[in-house]
């Protein structure tokens, strides 16, 4: 589902930003 893909992308992006 597009929603799941979007959520996963956002989660990965958040994690990446957290790592810096």
Swiss-Prot record:
Keywords: Hydrolase
The protein's Enzyme Commission number: 3.1.1.-
Activity regulation text: Inhibited by diethylpyrocarbonate, p-chloromercuribenzoate, Hg(2+) and Cu(2+). Not inhibited by the chelating reagents EDTA, 2,2'-dipyridyl, 1,10-phenanthroline, 8-hydroxyquinoline and tiron.
A molecular function (GO) term: hydrolase activity
GO annotation, biological process: xenobiotic catabolic process
PTM text: Exists in two forms, E1 and E2. E2 is probably produced by modification of E1.
Catalytic temperature dependence: Optimum temperature is 40 degrees Celsius with monobutyl phthalate as substrate.
pH dependence: Optimum pH is 7.5 with monobutyl phthalate as substrate. Retains 50% of maximum activity between pH 6.5 and pH 7.8.
UniProt keyword Signal, yes or no: no
Function noted in UniProt: Probably involved in the metabolism of xenobiotics and of natural substrates. Hydrolyzes medium-chain monoalkyl phthalate esters.
Name the record gives this protein: Monoalkyl phthalate esterase
């Amino acid at each position: 589902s597009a929603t799941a893909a979007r959520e996963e992308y956002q989660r990965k992006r958040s994690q990446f930003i957290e790592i810096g």
